[in-house]
Amino acid sequence: MRCSRDEHADLFRATLGGMGLTGHILEVEFRVVPIPTPWIVQETESVRDIDEFLAALAAAARDWPFTVGWIDCLARGARLGRGVLFRGRWAEPAEAPAPVPRPRGGPTVPFELPSWALNDLSVRLFNAVYAGVHARRGRRRVVHPQRFFWPLDGVRSWNRIYGRRGFTQFQCVLPERERPGATRRLLTAAAGRGGASFLCVVKDCGAEGEGLLSFPRPGVSVALDLPRRAETQQLVEVLAELVIVEGGRVYLAKDSFLRADQLARMEPRLAEFLRVRARWDPGRRLRSAQSVRLLGDPA
């Protein structure tokens, strides 16, 4: 079956962000955009707090196609939201080095760290080093796109830092314009509960997605890597409740802990998605562990 904006449009919209519940996608057609070179011009800027961070993020989004920020999620008080903002665009031919860029290998985490190694002290040390390194590198460089878009992959097997239990990622988007201070309140809640996250990534989120359960909407996206611990479920539930109050949404593709009642209160488009799903798959033959947890599908 083929679907698009013009053909079986309801199925098309349900499939975008539909978590695989509408069928197997065998072939996709999309339009690509030409780029001038395979290099990225990157600018970095150290920021002191969350207000300065959000202002710099909004200003960068007007002129730079790629913006992302790293935040020290353990900083509190006047330093809450301190971090590094990265701005990027494709380099023009005159700016780019002659050789085609190749990704460089980096150091490797050789083994899984013990659970006690990940604590507020070690995370604070990592954050201080990370902030210092980028502050010394200066404002503008030409870099490989892999280095810009996936900076953590410069350290191979970095997931071993979280030990055998691994980690989960909590990502949400908050309507900062309609709810000023929403990002500050989320970071305050995360820091106050000792999330001990090495990675807190903040992005400017663009237009509303077309899908019935698409994640994007105008606002600020916040992603936290959280070590899996006994208290992780409770921490995620607290953060999810805050997102609901602020009128935001959680990224379902990275969700492992959201409750069914939270999704129902968070997602006004859910009823339409369920209606379309019932039309095309009335027996709910396509289901997942997540749909069992969130949509009441049979296990």
Report residues per predicted region.
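Noncatalytic alpha-helical scaffold of FAD-dependent oxidoreductases
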Residues: M1-A299
